[in-house]
Amino acid sequence: MLQLATYLHSQGISITIAQYPNFNSPDSSNHPELTFLPLSSGNLSVADISGGFFKFIQTLNHNCKPHFREYLVQNMSSDDKESIVIIRDNLMFFAGEIAGELGLPSIILRGSNAVMLTASDIIPQLHQEGRFPPPDSLLQETIPELVPFRYKDLPFIGYPIHQTLEFSITMMTPKSPASAILINTLEFLEQSALTQIRDHYKVPVFTIGPLHKIVTTRSTSILEEDTSCINWLDKQSPKSVVYVSLGSLAKLDEKVASEMACGLAMSNHKFLWVVRPGMVHGFEWVEFLPDSLVGEMKARGLIVKWAPQTTVLAHNAVGGFWSHCGWNSTIECLAEGVPMMCQPFFADQLLNARYVSDVWKTGFEIVIEKGEIACAIKRVLVDEEGEEMRQRAMEIKEKVKIAINDGGSSYDSFKDLVAFISSL
């Protein structure tokens, strides 16, 4: 959202960002050109996500709505009303409700891929037909309405069905009338899903990805980045390092984390591993590492608490990315032409992993067993298969460059977006 706001401001549009002080919000002093509105989220904090994601989002929306509505009413004269447009994250449905109540146009920004919206749209239908939650016999089957994705790739499998349906209907699909939909993707990456969305919603759909390549801002990371890892990468051979990062939310059992460590050690290849404090259940940081591996891992790799990911992926030493396949990580990886080892956990990560392995063919899903991990790293860094994946990833990288430059699809989409906002 900050990247989008920065771009729109550069095009002469006045921007106010509603933010939640309890949630690692950007430092307003770093962005004097923007106005920031702190919203009251009650006593809610990031730690409350552990109580359940659905409940967390519902509570956040409930707590923020009154303050946001009051701000708009107090600062909106009859003249101002004609110039106010609300751009909201798709999970912040309260902003869409307020826009409807006050007669303001609203635009939805989706930070996930396009197919996440189409998948969420069909879940209620699949449930009515007895196909969601999918029985075991269907898990490996392709969903006819969502080729080439399988039932096992659907988001929210394993969640209580009533919560999933409510999330799909109330939160994930824009039921409040929206003037347009923005998606951080590219036309050539998701043509089928984008066609379905445009046919279904009948509103302009602007593909404005990858945002991190189009708009340069200060780091938007919610964790402090350890930039010393770049100096370490500078000393490594080209395409010799596997970069491992499972995002900012995933939690691992000790057994899984130890298996990952053993696999990295067995591979005999260099690695840069992001282990967030508290990422492994029951441990503050890397205390889970077997004593027998500590020396070996220090000699071959580097473990950091957080890394400047876009800089790491662009580094010549990085030959593969072992990822949870969050959409930001996926599109950042594609933009640098790096093959992926996929370890998805939830939400759109399963869909992204399927894209990587079966559509774009720039990576594969990894089995969490030390021997399998060692073989997977070899596949990416050494084997001919890895080189073929790298070539396909580099082809996508070149297409991304074309898309974000003058005359490209994302470049033109941004220009069209500015004209559209100005017309509202």
From Swiss-Prot:
<comment type="function">
    <text>May glycosylate diterpenes or flavonols in leaves.</text>
</comment>
<protein>
    <recommendedName>
        <fullName>UDP-glycosyltransferase 76H1</fullName>
        <ecNumber>2.4.1.-</ecNumber>
    </recommendedName>
</protein>
<dbReference type="GO" id="GO:0080044">
    <property type="term" value="F:quercetin 7-O-glucosyltransferase activity"/>
</dbReference>
<comment type="similarity">
    <text>Belongs to the UDP-glycosyltransferase family.</text>
</comment>
<dbReference type="Pfam" id="PF00201">
    <property type="entry name" value="UDPGT"/>
</dbReference>
<feature type="binding site">
    <location>
        <begin position="306"/>
        <end position="307"/>
    </location>
    <ligand>
        <name>UDP-alpha-D-glucose</name>
    </ligand>
</feature>
<feature type="binding site">
    <location>
        <position position="248"/>
    </location>
    <ligand>
        <name>UDP-alpha-D-glucose</name>
    </ligand>
</feature>
<feature type="binding site">
    <location>
        <begin position="324"/>
        <end position="332"/>
    </location>
    <ligand>
        <name>UDP-alpha-D-glucose</name>
    </ligand>
</feature>
<keyword id="KW-0808">Transferase</keyword>
<dbReference type="InterPro" id="IPR002213">
    <property type="entry name" value="UDP_glucos_trans"/>
</dbReference>
<dbReference type="GO" id="GO:0080043">
    <property type="term" value="F:quercetin 3-O-glucosyltransferase activity"/>
</dbReference>
<feature type="binding site">
    <location>
        <begin position="346"/>
        <end position="349"/>
    </location>
    <ligand>
        <name>UDP-alpha-D-glucose</name>
    </ligand>
</feature>
